[in-house]
Amino acid sequence: MHTENTIYMRGPKSRIFQLAADIQDWPALLPHYREVIVFEQSDSGDRKVVEMAAERADFPLPGLKFPVRWHSVQVCEPDAGRIYFKHTAGVATGMWVVWSLEDDPWGRGVKVTIAHDLTYPFGFLNGWFARNMVGDQFVHAIAGRTLRTLKQVVERDGLRSYK
């Protein structure tokens, strides 16, 4: 399963990166994140072992919220504009996630992409279940809401000068 979400944000790349990297603050920033527990953190803060809990809105029916929870290792590379996650527990165990931040040469802002890749060790899970249920219904939906909300925060806070 591979899925990508991309959005352009008008704000300083360093500020966008910081908001994305500071996952322990996400529950206060992102209404669909219920909890982030940091189990371990490197002295630099560039590596964290965490448990994250979010909710998928309007699933399985409009108005309902479906809770999801997973463990992950996060590694940040600020100079490269990359944040990596490896899911270590939960329904998407083994999933790799890469956040990429790039300046847009056309002046649309900072291009922020979240890519998810998951291959289950049991092949029968890699078809419809991985693609439609995990990928489309949860991963893509939650990542899209995360990016849209971060964009609102960055641009609402008056962080419009991004160079």
Task: Locate predicted features.
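Glycine-rich portal/gate segments that line the openings of hydrophobic small-molecule binding cavities
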Residues: 38-89, 144-163
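Intrinsic-disorder/low-complexity, polar/charged segments enriched in Ser/Thr/Lys/Arg/Asp/Glu/Gln
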Residues: 1-6, 49, 69-71, 82, ...
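Short amphipathic alpha-helical segments
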Residues: 12-18, 138, 142, 146
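Hydrophobic/aromatic beta-strand elements that line small-molecule binding cavities or substrate pockets
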Residues: 5-7, 36-39, 69-76, 87, ...
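Beta-strand/loop substructures that line and gate deep hydrophobic ligand-binding cavities in soluble
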Residues: 84-144, 161-162
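Hydrophobic pocket/interface hotspot
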Residues: 15-20, 26, 74, 112-114, ...
